[in-house]
Amino acid sequence: FFIEAQKNELVILWHVGATPSPHGDLSISHPLIIDDVARRFPGLTQIMAHLGHPWQRETMAVIRKNRRVFADISASWARPFDGYHALVRAQEWSVTNKILFGSDFPLWTPKVAIEGLYEIANLRSGNLPYVRKETIDQIVNQDALSMLRLSA
């Protein structure tokens, strides 16, 4: 499958992270699985959904080290504390350009998603790092089709 996907320049979207289903197997939804695939198929474009919640730190590590691996930010504003930490880490590790906008529609509209992301950018606590407005601007406005080498 991955050989053909890479050869045909397909994009793989992984639903990474938690599931509310008691039957869901979390061992197969961890971001490090995508790292393994990326090492074996470095030309394969992959996207991890939801910043890999609850494994956002691992998601940042995977997108940092693998050229063709990205993450989407869908639903990250719904857990502002987790979204804040993930975006601060993305800034510190210079991988904000590898984060794609997503709303998790139909659960949330793009408008609600964008408003939620800017609310995270407004969070401040003492001298702690914060999510820059420019980071949210970049995520919301960048051309994902070009990043993923897709045409409209």
Residue ranges and their predicted role:
Residues 107:
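Glycine-rich, Trp-frequent "lid" loop and neighboring beta-strands that shape
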